[in-house]
Amino acid sequence: MLLFMKILVGIAMGYLALYLVVPPGNFVYEGLRLPFWLLKLRKMVKPLPEPRKIKYGSHFRQYLLYFQPLDNSPSKQHVVIYIHGSGWQHGRPEMFVANAQWLTEQGYHAFFVSHRRIPQCDIRELRTDTGLAIKTVVDTLSEQGLSHKKILLCGNSAGGNLCALAMFDRRLLAGVGLSPDIFSALALFATPLDLRVMWPSPPLLMLTRMKNPEVFDLANPIHYLESEVQIPTLLIHGDQDGIAEYQNSVVFEEKLRSLGTKNLHFATLKGGMHLDSASWCIPGHPCCEIFGNWLERIENQ
């Protein structure tokens, strides 16, 4: 028992030392802070009505959680489709109830997407799941008498990557009989938007089958960016991001501007790490303020 306690103390001291000395801007720095960030989200959660779980395929990962707005919340023009991050391989919608709670308190219907994962799958299966999930949202809105609602497509990190592909590669939604014209706004947080500026991390290599050229293009949103984007678009990224390089959003914004896109807001979180861009549901956080103000503007358009 004494040996076990010594091992635990050693691990704790090592963790603390790394926490204090590792500089920002790398995945170790981010990983050391992830448990505390997740705990903070968990502590924010209040009792909510049970979300409706909607399957869109036979695999146990192919489902949505549908969160409905609280009864006393104001009605909104938009519904939100949200795809969470975690490197195309971790996480599940149930971990982001605090985000759903923030949206439902504002009056939004919110659909949180789960999809199959790497390494068992690659971007081809994830694209399929993204299309099927969005089609299921559209069908559910019709069933609920909510087809008049506008759709805000929203994603963080790897989830933002899938959202951007759904928006900019028309073939993705064509496979389920839809087009990107169903979207009225797009919000992307710390998103891998130009995979050419990404370091060859294991998740990226698994996603693209070791950067196979054909598969790589299927995963790279900027590859499909060919014309002006008409809908309101928000990019948020921390300039000290240690997971998805800040340059992703910088290069993507430059390309959008060069194509004539005007309804675009790019917010840089000064000193912000990867987790900061995912903190849009935390009151008082700069990301929450930026996202909240942008939502208010698009609601009033």
Positions of PLM-derived features:
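Primarily recognizes the serine-hydrolase "nucleophile elbow" in alpha/beta-hydrolase
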Residues: K135-P200
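Catalytic nucleophile-loop/oxyanion-hole region of alpha/beta-hydrolase
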Residues: G91-A100, F111-K150, A278-P286
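C-terminal catalytic histidine-bearing segment of alpha/beta-hydrolase fold enzymes
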Residues: V250-Q301
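Mobile cap/lid helix-loop segments that gate and shape the active-site cleft of serine hydrolases
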Residues: K43, T191-Y224
